[in-house]
Amino acid sequence: MTQDEKRIGTRMAYVNGIAILANFAIIALLIGPDAVGYDTTYGAMTDILQFVAGFSAACVVLVAGKVWDWENNFYFGLMSRIVFVVACIQMLYGVAATATANSVFDSTFNASEIQAMGGATTWFQFVAFGLYGLSLLSVDDGKLPGWGRSVGYGFVVLVLGAQLGSLFGLVPATLFVPIFVLGGVILYPAFIISVGNTISKS
């Protein structure tokens, strides 16, 4: 691993965590959690943050793959490649709604419909990141700090449990929201930052 890769992986881990937190803050505090459809006031901001989150996640996955030797750890290598594709899909849909809303050309779908298409992939994205975290933790040989492993397992258990339960309608909305906040907005950014810290010391 080159020094440039180490620097990029470390910085992008922080960028990813910050983008996730900033996006949630805008949605929760400015747009409102009950809002439906593309928001013409803040939609561009959340779309750009989603694009940044996808790009930074792709960078972290590639560098982390070298740190945890994805070529010799099959399931970790597999999930790394799957999550890289998921991150690309995040980028693909990241600014699509805003681009559609501001397009000078006629479109078959409006911005809200484009946003809904991207949202339809969210369930699998969470599952993919959860399985990626689990595969990384399974091959970690002491590189991650103790707190990083703790928040990592917390994230994995919450996100996979919640997504599996929601698939069959077993998680009520009143419970899903706090699980989402704890797992996706607190534990995930902390875990990805711990990965960045490990990259910087490798």
Language model features with spans:
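Hydrophobic, aromatic-enriched alpha-helical segments typical of multi-pass transmembrane helices
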Residues: M1-S202
